[in-house]
Amino acid sequence: MKKLVLIVLVALFSVQLMAQRVPSEKKMSISAGVLQGGGGLVGADFEFMLGNHFSAQAGIGLTSFGAGINYHFKPFINSSMISLLYWHQGIGNTYTQALLGPVYTFRAPKVFQFQIGLGAKVGEGPKIPEANKNVPLMLLYSIGVYFPL
């Protein structure tokens, strides 16, 4: 009887033990969502690791494009990061503004991400709204999903 109780207890405790999460070995990712790819209504970004903590990204959205350099807090593509991003909103006659600034990106261990930061205006186009003409800083934000490749 003691052996049976001991076996049951060992089995119960062994089920509860969990190993450490294995970090992603993937070195690239694609993200898509609202205000991704340079701040377009919808867009996508392609990101690739340059080294242990650094990565680069480039993206395109609905009449927008952007690029950036990122520093990941952990040396994995699926970790949160801080970035220096360039957003170019509008193309040709629809060009509104170009922004450059720091952004914090939160990445959940799987799929979900969001960004928030500030962008300094480095260019204005013919379609910039009158209310934004004298505003030197703009809030940069986006929400979406990412998929390590």
Model-derived features: where do they sit?
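Short, positively charged, low-complexity/disordered linker segments
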Residues: 95-116
